[in-house]
Structures are given as structure tokens and as C-alpha cells.
Amino acid sequence: ATTKGGRAAGLKAARAAFYSGDIAATIVKYHRDNGGLLSADDMSQFRVRFEKPLRTTYAGVELYACGPWCQGPVLPQALSLLAGYDLRAAGHNTPEYIHLVIEALKLAFADRHRYYGDPNFVNVPMDTLLSPEYAARRRQMIRSGEAWPELPPAGNAGDAVQAKLPDPTRGEPVPAADTSYVCVIDRFGNGFSATPSDASSETPVIPGTGLCPSSRGSQSWC
């Protein structure tokens, strides 16, 4: 392909081999043999999309985040809640400051569990979740000196998704391996930030390819 059509043709041929050729067949077979859900159609029909990021503002700063196909909206949701407090007056990393940040994140993560999904397959009420009115209602669940021992109930952001889902259930947390995060800052102000848990014991190498499914992808059989 490179000889006949140059670099562009070579890249197309490489993509075809990965998504619909012999490499794709090997990947799909590995998933199938291990009880996974990935199919040949999933591979061949995949296309990268260009989309507008979510946008919000906090303290005069514009914030852009990925859409609800991942947990990107959690941060703007949490900041929308925190916009109702004077964190500067609370003092950086004081008990009050930390309490407010943690409780806001709990509320945002509760909505993530309830509402987030791929917009190509489910209607996510993102405009409501990021609206000041919704944040004001949810903010009432943050109480001074009192913390939710687990995730609080999700908010009522409309029935677009809610009508299709069962009521949330609560139970004892199950100890398990989870995301590892490392952040180090030295005395000169140099920072290192990494989330090294994507490749783990749950992401085996697919034989003959040198490739491993992501931790998210391997969840279809682990």
C-alpha cells in the first residue's frame, strides 16, 4: 500500500489490518475465548469522533471536560456545587475546605453512577446536571460537620435515563484492586502526576499481538 499510494495509503492499510483484518480477528477471538463482549462488528465499525467538550466556568476560569461517555463531567459538576461556597475564606486544606470538596465530589460521583453513559446509546441530561438550578438543589445535601458515609442518592435530573434504570441499591463495599494514583512535588516545584493502574493483572497481553486490552475493556470478562 505504501508503494502504490504513499504514506496515506499505508496508514489506511494499517488501520484496516487492526480494525478489520488479522489483528482484529486475533483480538476478537481472545475476547470471545475469555467470555468477553467485544465483537468483529465492534472493531470494524469503530470510528474516532470529534466532538465539542463540555464547558463551564468556576471563579472566572473556563473549564473544559470530556463528555459523559467517561467520568469527565464529574469535575465540572463538583465545581458547580462548590461555586456556592467561599473556599478562599475557608482556608486552603482546612477541615472545612476538605469537607466541602469531598462532599461535592460524592454528590457528583453519585450522579455519575446514575446518569452517565455514551450519548450515542443513552440520553444523558447533561444540561440539567450542569445547571446552576440543579447544583443549588444538590448543594442542600452538603451539611456542615456531617459527612455522607457512602455515596449519597443521585439527584432527580429528569426521567430520560431514570425511567430505564432500577432504583440505586446500597451495600457493603467490596475490597478490590482499584485505580492507583501517584503525585509527587519536590522542593523545587517540579511535579510528577501519574495514574499507573491501567495496565495490571487484569490486562493480559493478547497472544501474538503484544497488545493488551485496557482495564475498562477487560471488565467485560474479569
Which residues are covered by each model-predicted region?
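Conserved catalytic alpha/beta cores of large enzymes that bind or transform nucleotide phosphates
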Residues: 102, 216, 221-222
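A short, polar/charged loop-to-alpha-helix boundary motif
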Residues: 201-218
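Internal maturation/activation junctions in enzymes
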Residues: 5-9, 24, 36, 84-197, ...
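M16/insulysin-pitrilysin zinc metalloprotease superfamily fold
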Residues: 72-88
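Long, well-ordered, tryptophan-enriched scaffold segments
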Residues: 1-63, 68
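Structural recognition of the beta-strand scaffold that forms the well-ordered cores
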Residues: 55-57, 62-65, 74, 183-184, ...
